[in-house]
């Protein structure tokens, strides 16, 4: 679905769970996994990602939940496709491959629009 906005991608991904988990348990796992990530923020339970909050940045907002009726994991993610686009991804990957700090050349807060 195309939304009437000039930039940004809001994506929802679902996956079938192989064991029964609560939203709180999955949220804790994601929060722990991404705790040291420079660019990924796992939002508090119930707070949805907003593309406008990421305009011009290399950051990602993520929300996780469990749909207990269907036993599916639901992950919602927002990025600014012009901030965290192919060029920024290439810089981030090159930094990692060359042993540089992952954030080198990518530390910008965005446009604040």
Language model region names:
Residues 61, 66-113:
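NAD(P)-dependent Rossmann-like dehydrogenase/reductase catalytic/cofactor-binding core
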